[in-house]
């Protein structure tokens, strides 16, 4: 069954995740295919992006699709006063799928409710970023050969980081042993996210208390752009730095992931350790998004 909209990590079942993982394996080393020849993908980035926009663009081209779109709200008619609904309706006339990033929570869900073509959420405010969770989980799957039974540690800004929300929700489709949530008290995971989880969660402020138990350390930057109060940001902006001291306490086969961009939360010296997998993680963005495009737009025998 073809996927419709991908607004949240919860839009994918466990079977969906594994089916996409199999497709990523097939797409990882290809130069160009024609599976989406004749299709048009709209990249509707109302909020600026570099890595996400470019990887979606590349993924679509490598599958043979044409790509249209915009890289900021200022380059659209919204700058002239057009509302979001009308913009989405217009893009429906030009394309077969909309990849959308927006600064407001829930914008992708709103778009999916009025769109006749699939919406893929490329990040909406502090809400979700489901395709990043796909990349995260595929990285873990490739490194360990499994996701079930692993102990996770999510460190940093767990309140505003949409990548954290999507990963936590995606993990409900698997069987993690437990998840440590490591953050300052001001940046804890929001209650509405915690209430939907079905696995053991332990909150702490000290990574040194739990680092020896962690298989996957997922680090996020402090989201300066999400803070309303500059003073509050200054209080927490350098709460944690993953350095060699911390890494040397990890399991030998433990891994460090980061959705990027990185600021100061991971010391550059960590890059050369065998635990650092965040650049490998980033290298998987294109084939993962190719697999998702194929699931959403590709011709399938069961359609």
UniProtKB/Swiss-Prot annotation:
The keyword Repeat does not apply. Carbamoyl phosphate binds at residues 51-52, 101, 129, 132, 260-261. Keywords: Pyrimidine biosynthesis, Transferase. Transmembrane segments: none annotated. It catalyses: carbamoyl phosphate + L-aspartate = N-carbamoyl-L-aspartate + phosphate + H(+). Its EC number is 2.1.3.2. One of its GO terms (molecular function) is aspartate carbamoyltransferase activity. Belongs to the aspartate/ornithine carbamoyltransferase superfamily. ATCase family. Catalyzes the condensation of carbamoyl phosphate and aspartate to form carbamoyl aspartate and inorganic phosphate, the committed step in the de novo pyrimidine nucleotide biosynthesis pathway. Heterooligomer of catalytic and regulatory chains. This is Aspartate carbamoyltransferase catalytic subunit. The lineage of its organism: Archaea, Thermoproteota, Thermoprotei, Sulfolobales, Sulfolobaceae. The gene is pyrB.
């Amino acid at each position: 069954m073809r996927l419709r909209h991908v607004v949240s990590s919860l839009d994918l079942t466990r079977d969906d995740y594994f089916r996409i993982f199999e497709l990523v394996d097939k797409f990882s080393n290809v130069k160009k295919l024609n599976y989406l020849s004749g299709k048009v993908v709209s990249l509707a980035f109302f909020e600026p992006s570099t890595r996400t926009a470019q990887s979606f663009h590349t993924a679509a081209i490598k599958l043979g699709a044409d790509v249209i779109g915009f890289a900021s709200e200022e380059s659209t008619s919204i700058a002239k006063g057009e509302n979001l609904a009308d913009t989405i309706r217009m893009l429906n006339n030009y394309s077969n799928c909309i990849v959308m990033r927006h600064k407001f929570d829930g914008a992708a869900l709103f778009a999916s409710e009025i769109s006749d073509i699939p919406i893929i959420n490329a990040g909406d405010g502090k809400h979700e970023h489901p395709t990043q969770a796909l990349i995260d989980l595929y990285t873990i799957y490739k490194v360990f050969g499994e996701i079930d039974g692993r102990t996770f540690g999510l460190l940093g800004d767990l309140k505003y980081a949409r990548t954290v929300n999507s990963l936590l929700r995606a993990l409900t489709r698997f069987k993690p042993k437990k998840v440590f949530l490591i953050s300052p008290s001001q940046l804890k995971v929001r209650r509405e996210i915690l209430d939907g989880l079905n696995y053991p969660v332990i909150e702490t402020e000290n990574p040194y208390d739990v680092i020896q138990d962690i298989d996957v350390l997922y680090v996020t930057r402090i989201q300066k752009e999400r803070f309303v109060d500059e003073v509050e940001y200054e209080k927490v902006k350098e709460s944690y730095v993953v350095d060699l001291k911390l890494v040397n306490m990890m399991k030998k086969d433990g891994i460090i992931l980061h959705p990027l961009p990185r600021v100061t939360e991971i010391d550059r010296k960590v890059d050369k350790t065998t635990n650092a997998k965040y650049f490998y993680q980033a290298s998987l963005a294109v084939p993962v998004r190719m697999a998702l495009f194929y699931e959403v737009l590709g011709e399938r025998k069961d359609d």
